[in-house]
Amino acid sequence: MAQKLWEKSVEVNKDIERFTVGRDREMDLYLAKHDVLGSMAHITMLESIGLLTKEELAQLLTELKDIYASAERGEFVIEEGVEDVHSQVELMLTRRLGDVGKKIHSGRSRNDQVLLDLKLFTRTQIREVAEAVEQLFHVLIRQSERYKNVLMPGYTHLQIAMPSSFGLWFGAYAESLVDDMLFLQAAFKMCNKNPLGSAAGYGSSFPLNRTMTTELLGFDSLNYNVVYAQMGRGKMERNVAFALATLAGTISKLAFDACMFNSQNFGFVKLPDECTTGSSIMPHKKNPDVFELTRAKCNKLQSLPQQIMMIANNLPSGYFRDLQIIKEVFLPAFQELKDCLQMTTYIMNEIKVNEHILDDDKYLFIFSVEEVNRLAREGMPFRDAYKKVGLDIEAGHFSHDKQVHHTHEGSIGNLCNDEISALMQRTIEGFNFQGMEQAEKTLLGRK
């Protein structure tokens, strides 16, 4: 059985070991590739300060690239009796290279190692989330342009209120994603700082070159203060979780709208038949399960920041094992959000809209404000116009040609989709993912 990195002469009670390891072996599979990348940067730095020879570095890099490839193929496993990904990688290197494999932990603690793994994993996942958001954004903008002249009711208090349009509806969610991406970008910038070299949270007596590992891994900067680097555990995950929750909030609201508008009582949109499910008893049913599940999953994601805060709340500075539990709720959250984004993108691209909603006379009164404004433009004081139209409605005399004349920025007749698209493009460029991508390729010896 593999020896633990911290093992001494006393054997730990097996029940205690099982409880303390928990789901770490399962969760650390998310981090395997990133742990290897971090080790590659670390040993390159160790060679530069004389703690490894060039030959030892070459041997280690060869084996680490092989381990990385196995993780890419989904073949990397954490063996029974091995606590975590860090221990597994070191064990594999020691088996292959003997004492040389035991040198990779010099100047490093599992504390800064897992901090690094989490940051490398998280920034990669943020990039994938951003790509998925961008795809949904473009679908929404296309649909907004396609249906910009199709009117629909706007609601306040779930009562018919004023004319809206599908151009506004699709475009509103597109612009919401821009603000969500700004939040995600801020979380990315806080995440994209190098904690490596902080060791257990108090640095090392080795002359570590932290700037070198920062550059090798493509970080924007580093967490300078080693105590703060460790304090960032839990804080980074919480900040990112807030960004994910913000995105999830937008998708949840869109899913609610789609479910409601798809119902026969509204009949504003129609989901593709292949995207609905049936009933075991009612043969006519076409249920929007995909959006109901999206809504539930996104609502669950919105609880993620609170879960993380409750785990990390009231911890003093320094490392505590409580932080391990955050991985269980944090690491899987990215895939859940990406799944929701993918499904929403697909269905929003295929959804059909009812182009004759306002032909129904029950929506006539949504044009009341249009009539008030017409009278005001003709010179009648607004309050008098408001009163006249109200009395006409009560008397059953109200009529309108069901035309709207909105021209200001962001209105039915002037959606400003080009401006919204430009905002999204600038936001995407602000992430600057190229630096991290190129650094990782260089470490792996890939073009």
Swiss-Prot record:
Lineage of source species: Bacteria, Pseudomonadati, Bacteroidota, Bacteroidia, Bacteroidales
Associated pathway: Amino-acid biosynthesis; L-arginine biosynthesis; L-arginine from L-ornithine and carbamoyl phosphate: step 3/3
Keyword set, alphabetical order: Amino-acid biosynthesis, Arginine biosynthesis, Cytoplasm, Lyase
EC code: 4.3.2.1
CDD domains: Argininosuccinate_lyase
Protein name: Argininosuccinate lyase
EC supergroup of this enzyme: lyase
An example molecular function term from Gene Ontology annotations: argininosuccinate lyase activity
